[in-house]
Structures are given as structure tokens and as C-alpha cells.
């Protein structure tokens, strides 16, 4: 019932040098080929001197100040063209 060697699982999880080298090469390959939105992080702390940070107004035409709104979203309510059932829908004005 009990294993003859108490630490037998340590040997099963060990990795040899060729596997470690292959894992390192794959990690470097995938890290090198990841894309980011900007190349350097030097522009993170840039502040526009002409922008008033105390003014918390949201730009018009933008959703939460980030995404532009192109079309207004209609109200979600049942219409005569949709959400009707059977003959009652055909007979109702």
C-alpha cells in the first residue's frame, strides 16, 4: 500500500537538461513574438500641460470617455414586427 521509496514523486517531476533547454527556448520565442500597444513604456507618465485634470467632464459623443458612439442604441421594447405570437399578431392593428 505504501510506496517503498517515500520520495518517489520527486524523481518523476524532475526535468533533464535537454527538456529545460527546450522549454527556455520556447519561452523566449513566445515572449519575443508577443505584440503590445506601444514599444516603450516611457510615455506612461507623460502629462499634457494644457489639460485641466481637475475638470472631470466626459467628452461628448464618447461612451465613458473612451469609445466613440456612432449610432444611438434604440430602446429595447417589443414591436409589431417582433416578439408576437401566431394569429393574434396578424389580426392586431
Curated annotation (Swiss-Prot):
InterPro entries: IDA-like. Its main location: secreted. One of its GO terms (cellular component) is extracellular region. It is found in: Secreted, Extracellular space. The keyword Signal applies. GO terms for biological process: floral organ abscission. IDL4 is only partially redundant with IDA. This is Protein IDA-LIKE 4. The gene is IDL4.
Amino acid at each position: 500500500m505504501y510506496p517503498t521509496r517515500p520520495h518517489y514523486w520527486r524523481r518523476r517531476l524532475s526535468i533533464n537538461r535537454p527538456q529545460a533547454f527546450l522549454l527556455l527556448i520556447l519561452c523566449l520565442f513566445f515572449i519575443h513574438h508577443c505584440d503590445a500597444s506601444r514599444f516603450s513604456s516611457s510615455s506612461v507618465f507623460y502629462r499634457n500641460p494644457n489639460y485641466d485634470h481637475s475638470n472631470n467632464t466626459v467628452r461628448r459623443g464618447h461612451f465613458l470617455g473612451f469609445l466613440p458612439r456612432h449610432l444611438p442604441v434604440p430602446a429595447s421594447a417589443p414591436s409589431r414586427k417582433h416578439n408576437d405570437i401566431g394569429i393574434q399578431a396578424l389580426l392586431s392593428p
